[in-house]
Swiss-Prot record:
Recorded family membership: Belongs to the XseB family.
This protein's name: Exodeoxyribonuclease 7 small subunit
SUPFAM superfamilies according to UniProt: XseB-like
Calcium keyword on record: no
Reactions catalysed: Exonucleolytic cleavage in either 5'- to 3'- or 3'- to 5'-direction to yield nucleoside 5'-phosphates
The protein's enzyme class: hydrolase
UniProt cross-references to PANTHER family, sorted A to Z: EXODEOXYRIBONUCLEASE 7 SMALL SUBUNIT (PTHR34137:SF1)
Enzyme Commission number(s): 3.1.11.6
Pfam families reported for this sequence: Exonuc_VII_S (PF02609)
Gene: xseB
Organism encoding this protein: Pseudomonas fluorescens (strain SBW25)
GO MF annotation: an example: exodeoxyribonuclease VII activity
Localisation per UniProt entry: Cytoplasm
């Protein structure tokens, strides 16, 4: 269940980031609101980058074989 929560948190952070970008690109925010949105966006970006880095580490651990790391490219189309 924790894995789903992390995935949902990542997806929500990504959606929130997209919303902030759209608001900033729209150009209707005041300078103060733009700076606040920018700060929030930086935080969301860091959260997303951290979640992606953790996921990458988990994939590398799962691919570990015979005490050596066998890095393989991720292929979403590859059957399990």
């Amino acid at each position: 269940m924790a894995r789903k929560k992390v995935a949902l948190d990542f997806e929500q952070s990504l959606a929130d980031l997209q919303t902030l970008v759209e608001r900033l690109e729209n150009g209707e925010l005041s300078l103060e609101d733009s700076l606040t949105a920018f700060e929030q966006g930086i935080g969301l970006t860091r959260d997303c980058q951290s979640a992606l880095a953790q996921a990458e580490q988990k994939v590398q651990v799962l691919l570990e074989r015979d005490g050596e790391l066998a890095e393989e490219p991720f292929d979403a189309e590859q059957p399990e």
